[in-house]
């Protein structure tokens, strides 16, 4: 049985296979053709961290695939508090067909999956956001005119996930963060090893201008992640030169697209003018969460016996 916890668990061929499936299902959806790939299946959606896009996309997705979603908030379930995670996993997985977790600790996801009898999907953790990267690359394949990617901002779960995707697929990735905010060293090392096989080109820099020059795709994310509100004043000062504004964006390719996983804080990681001029890109990316995740769920269902 396969889980979707990190992109590093998948080969290039498997990632592209999932995205091809997602594209097929998206075309069917646009034609109002809803194939019941997951008829009568229940997806448990466990949220330690709240999210508009994650809940709407997964709940709508499983419904359009012929199943139903079961929403469990932090008020309904306390992972590891009271009942051990392994017991929670055993109980929930005995009653549902698949589980999606949006949590703080990646280790909680790994523990849940270890004892789950059904496929488990990482809806987000503090370390990684793999479902978002599947939507992002789906968007790149649809509308970008190249695959040189610049990530500007915090070395958070998004930068870690970009390292995984680019290093597996053999892409060129430039990451610019302020000093002290680099991506997790563990993921940097994994990416370097992957790149030896895939031929990926990865640049880590503290200069956003160096990173963005010649990029076909510019990606950014909030500087203050959920639970880091007390760091806002310090981070705003440290990230001052990392706002994707008109001047910085002008260094990218003329037809570069802009990606942001949302919510966006305009005037901080991206200027309002740049955001609005690339709204088409960003909201297509948001929509593609629905389609990419449907592809993931259908693929996992087909590989239950692996």
UniProtKB/Swiss-Prot annotation:
InterPro entries: Asp/Orn_carbamoyltranf_P-bd (IPR006132), Asp/Orn_carbamoylTrfase (IPR006130), Asp/Orn_carbamoylTrfase_sf (IPR036901), Asp_carbamoyltransf_Asp/Orn-bd (IPR006131), Orn/put_carbamltrans (IPR002292), OTCase_ArgI (IPR024904). GO terms for molecular function: amino acid binding; ornithine carbamoyltransferase activity. Pfam families: OTCace (PF00185), OTCace_N (PF02729). It catalyses: carbamoyl phosphate + L-ornithine = L-citrulline + phosphate + H(+). Its EC number is 2.1.3.3. Pathway: Amino-acid biosynthesis; L-arginine biosynthesis; L-arginine from L-ornithine and carbamoyl phosphate: step 1/3. L-ornithine binds at residues 157, 221, 225-226. One of its GO terms (biological process) is arginine biosynthetic process via ornithine. Carbamoyl phosphate binds at residues 51-54, 78, 102, 129-132, 261-262, 289. Keywords: Amino-acid biosynthesis, Arginine biosynthesis, Cytoplasm, Transferase. It is an enzyme of class 2 (transferase). It is found in: Cytoplasm. One of its GO terms (cellular component) is cytoplasm. NCBIfam families: orni_carb_tr (TIGR00658), PRK00779.1 (NF001986). Belongs to the aspartate/ornithine carbamoyltransferase superfamily. OTCase family. Reversibly catalyzes the transfer of the carbamoyl group from carbamoyl phosphate (CP) to the N(epsilon) atom of ornithine (ORN) to produce L-citrulline. This is Ornithine carbamoyltransferase. The gene is argF.
């Amino acid at each position: 049985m396969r889980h979707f916890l990190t992109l590093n668990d998948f080969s290039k061929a498997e990632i592209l296979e999932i995205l091809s499936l997602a594209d097929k299902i998206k075309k069917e959806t646009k034609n109002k053709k809803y194939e019941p790939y997951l008829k009568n299946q229940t997806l448990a959606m466990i949220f330690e961290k709240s999210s508009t896009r994650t809940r709407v996309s997964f709940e709508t997705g499983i419904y359009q695939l012929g199943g139903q979603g079961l929403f469990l908030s932090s008020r309904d379930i306390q992972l590891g508090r009271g009942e051990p995670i392994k017991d929670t996993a055993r109980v929930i997985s005995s009653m549902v067909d698949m589980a999606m977790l949006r949590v703080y600790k990646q280790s909680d996801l790994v523990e849940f999956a270890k004892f789950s009898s059904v496929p488990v999907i990482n809806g987000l953790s503090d370390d990684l956001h793999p479902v978002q990267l599947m939507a992002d690359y789906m968007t790149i394949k649809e509308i970008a005119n190249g695959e040189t990617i610049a990530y500007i901002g915090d070395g958070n779960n998004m930068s870690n996930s970009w390292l995984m995707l680019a290093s597996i697929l053999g892409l060129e990735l430039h990451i610019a963060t302020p000093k002290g905010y680099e991506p997790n060293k563990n993921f940097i090392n994994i990416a370097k090893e992957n790149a030896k096989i895939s031929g990926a080109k990865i640049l880590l820099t503290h200069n956003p201008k160096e990173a963005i020059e010649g990029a076909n795709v510019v990606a950014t994310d909030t500087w203050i992640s959920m639970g880091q509100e007390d760091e806002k004043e310090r981070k705003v000062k440290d990230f001052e030169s990392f706002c994707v504004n008109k001047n910085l964006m002008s260094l990218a390719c003329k037809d570069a697209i802009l990606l942001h996983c949302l919510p966006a804080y305009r005037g901080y990681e991206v200027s309002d003018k740049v955001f609005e001029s690339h709204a088409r890109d960003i909201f297509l990316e948001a929509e593609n969460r629905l389609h990419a995740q449907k592809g993931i769920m259908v693929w996992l269902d087909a590989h239950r016996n692996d």
